[in-house]
């Protein structure tokens, strides 16, 4: 097909549905392929734009198709949905991807590298292990409370668990259960520490992450995740765009010429947003030891707004600073 200029692909686990268009938007081909057949088809096509939704497997396919000489564009599924016509099927989805791609104002997702995907997987596994560790601690608290034993909040139950059977009469099966939970807690701690060591080792060889560590309040985990999400930062036109992508800006609902700002939009990566807010709170807790324009700005905001509002505003500012540090290759300066 020498006239094809745009190919929309609806990705699947084993099957791929394509919709091919020429420069005027007329349909040239609709066909279903397997993974191998799709590669063979794209290898014989002239260089063109290949568009896909940024879903599972999209970043790998983007890298693979780019090696075949095509220009790959990834679109967030939420921007494709308005272009779906009538009933939904795989071919209509592929056509909707083509329609969305042809819009001049459409926002696209930059394909991730293999290293970025691997680091993102490490962060997701660590986050899951941390949640599992909290769950194990809460279970031990709850089981002891059912037998009238109230323990302090946090990991104190772990430190005092060995003395609990000696101080209180408990059924043998409960003691064995608590022992298993304690062992599981220790296993989770070991896994989390191992992943954090891998992140620190990778961080030592990443120049961008090292520059991000110069930002006050930013630690190892946050710097690693920021470096993974930002890449070279060129996917965002400005620091304002990156701040908005983290969901740390007010949600707008305006009509009739009246502008209404609501709570933060909470878009994007929830884990990154949570870490940035934690970094902001750490900075605010040690505000008396901070100096420079950022500290003066935070002090001024605290005189006018609640500390929770200031924490979100500071988290947004830290995200914008991270974009500048990444794109300009500089370090943070007070």
Swiss-Prot record:
Q: Which UniProt keywords apply?
A: DNA recombination, DNA-binding, Transposable element, Transposition
> Which biological processes are named by the entry's GO terms?
DNA transposition
Pfam families in the record, alphabetically?
DEDD_Tnp_IS110, Transposase_20
**Is Membrane given among the entry's keywords?**
no
| Any one GO molecular function term | DNA binding
Note the superkingdom of the native organism.
Bacteria
Q: Indicate whether Transport appears among the record's keywords.
A: no
Annotated function: Required for the transposition of the insertion element.
Query: Family assignment?
Result: Belongs to the transposase IS1111A/IS1328/IS1533 family.
Question: What's the protein name?
Answer: Transposase for insertion sequence element IS1328
Which species expresses this protein natively? Yersinia enterocolitica
């Amino acid at each position: 097909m020498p006239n094809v200029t745009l190919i929309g692909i609806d990705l699947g686990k084993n099957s791929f549905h394509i919709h091919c268009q020429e420069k005027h938007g007329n349909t040239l081909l609709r066909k279903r392929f397997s993974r191998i057949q799709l590669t063979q088809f794209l290898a014989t096509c002239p260089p063109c734009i290949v568009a896909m939704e940024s879903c599972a497997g999209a970043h790998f396919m983007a890298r693979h198709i780019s090696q075949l000489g095509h220009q790959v564009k990834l679109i967030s599924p939420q921007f494709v949905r308005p272009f779906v016509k009538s009933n939904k099927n795989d071919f209509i989805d592929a056509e909707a991807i083509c329609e969305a791609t042809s819009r001049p104002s459409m926002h696209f997702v930059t394909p991730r590298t293999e290293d970025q995907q691997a680091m993102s997987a490490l962060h997701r596994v660590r986050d899951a292990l941390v949640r599992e560790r909290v769950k194990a601690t809460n279970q031990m608290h709850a089981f002891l409370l059912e037998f009238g034993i109230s323990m302090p909040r946090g990991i104190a139950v772990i430190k005092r668990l060995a003395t609990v059977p000696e101080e209180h009469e408990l059924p043998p099966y409960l003691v064995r259960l608590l022992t298993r939970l304690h062992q599981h807690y220790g296993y989770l701690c070991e896994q989390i520490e191992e992943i954090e060591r891998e992140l620190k080792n990778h961080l030592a060889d990443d120049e961008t992450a090292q520059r991000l560590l110069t930002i006050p309040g930013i630690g190892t985990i946050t710097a690693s995740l920021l470096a993974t999400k930002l890449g070279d930062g060129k996917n965002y036109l400005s620091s304002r765009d990156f701040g908005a992508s983290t969901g740390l800006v007010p949600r707008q609902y305006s009509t009739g010429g009246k502008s209404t700002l609501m709570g933060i939009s909470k878009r994007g990566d929830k884990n990154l947003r949570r870490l940035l807010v934690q970094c902001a709170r750490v900075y605010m807790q040690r505000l008396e030891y901070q100096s420079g324009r950022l500290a003066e700005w935070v002090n001024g905001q605290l005189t006018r707004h609640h500390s929770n509002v200031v924490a979100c505003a500071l988290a947004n500012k830290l995200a914008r600073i991270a974009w500048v540090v990444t794109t300009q290759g500089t370090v943070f300066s007070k």
